[in-house]
């Protein structure tokens, strides 16, 4: 898998933005990706050094439209800790 297939989008929330100040970034990633693949993809895409990764599988929410019930897709979130003094400039402007 290439890093374009692994990294899907940054997580956009107040909690994620406050963590960016401490060098911790959150991304939605491919559910099939492993921690080592995620680490390599982030280091290759952004040119930073990753020192820790936590991952979690987030189940899709049930949604209802009228009398029909559906479910959103399950997703995987990766919380990435960067080396001291490093940041991802592409996401720094959003915080």
Curated annotation (Swiss-Prot):
Gene3D superfamilies per record: 3.30.70.330
Classification via PROSITE patterns: RIBOSOMAL_L23
UniProt keyword annotations, A-Z: Ribonucleoprotein, Ribosomal protein, RNA-binding, rRNA-binding
Positions of transmembrane segments: none
Pfam families membership: Ribosomal_L23
Any GO CC annotation of this UniProt entry: cytosolic large ribosomal subunit
Entry annotated with the keyword RNA-binding: yes
InterPro entries found in the cross-reference section: Nucleotide-bd_a/b_plait_sf, Ribosomal_uL23-like, Ribosomal_uL23/eL15/eS24_sf, Ribosomal_uL23_CS
GO-annotated molecular function: rRNA binding; structural constituent of ribosome
Record GO biological process: translation
Family from the record: Belongs to the universal ribosomal protein uL23 family.
Function, in words: One of the early assembly protein it binds 23S rRNA. One of the proteins that surrounds the polypeptide exit tunnel on the outside of the subunit. Forms the main docking site for trigger factor binding to the ribosome.
Subunit organization: Part of the 50S ribosomal subunit. Contacts protein L29 and trigger factor when it is bound to the ribosome.
Protein name from the UniProt record: Large ribosomal subunit protein uL23
Source organism of the structure: Deinococcus radiodurans (strain ATCC 13939 / DSM 20539 / JCM 16871 / CCUG 27074 / LMG 4051 / NBRC 15346 / NCIMB 9279 / VKM B-1422 / R1)
